[in-house]
């Protein structure tokens, strides 16, 4: 059987005019001799099939409602039209679908080129231009203005709520006083003590004046010395300053009436109303806490008592007797 097949193949190659050795061993990577099928096809006299040709029409001459039925040749436009038709059992050409006269909406649709619907994005389309920074700044300013308006409205609402609560508390207090009698209000806190009057300021002298007087005395006493000797610059002595420290008195500075008087508060300012309500609330809490501590009689700790009594000063230094000897030496000289 195999021998018969070989003889048949040899007979076919002999009729074609191709040797068996050249078919099996001589190969080229290109042309008609690269495979047996191509060699046979080039030597056989076969009739070629006609190629399919498509007619591409422009959009202007595609189809016009004035001449229906003239454009009956299938083109690539029909392919796009068929791809767009959904829910149809069979494909139809444009001439069959557009047998009726189109409306105005259809004319606008016909002017556009039929295109197939694809899910992938079209990269050929131009990207939308980004907003300029000026427009972004304007939008940010508008948002900021809107937020400021909302904050002002919230402040006004909070101030209104505070005033309503105060009015309700006042009315409730009046009703309680009429029914159960008036309760004496808590006395206001005492004002801070006034500074002591400045008496005897002209009698006491400052440390600077004493130093000046002693310098003048020394200058008068030093005139008897020899004028040729160079005079060394005198440095202030701290012992002299410390000696007269107890006789120094501070001046009392009176505050002006403008600083003492409180600033006028606008009754319509929502921030001022809120601040006043918070002050009242926390003052009431602080007063109640202090009253509870007084009633309970909580003793203060030893550290607090010592911190209140002990003050830093020269009385904390240990007496050595050296300071007294130095002061006596200075006074003798």
Swiss-Prot record:
Transmembrane segments: none annotated. It comes from Homo sapiens. Residues 184-198 have a biased composition (Pro residues). Residues 177-198, 288-315 are annotated as: Disordered. Residues 179-304 are annotated as: Necessary and sufficient to promote mitochondrial fission. Residues 137-169 form a coiled coil. It is found in: Mitochondrion. One of its GO terms (biological process) is mitochondrial fission. Residues 1-48 form a transit peptide. May play a role in mitochondrial aerobic respiration. May also regulate mitochondrial organization and fission. The modification Phosphoserine is found at residue 119. This is Mitochondrial fission regulator 1. InterPro entries: Mtfr1. GO terms for cellular component: cytosol; mitochondrion; plasma membrane. It comes from the Eukaryota. Keywords: Coiled coil, Mitochondrion, Phosphoprotein, Transit peptide. Residues 288-307 have a biased composition (Basic and acidic residues). Belongs to the MTFR1 family.
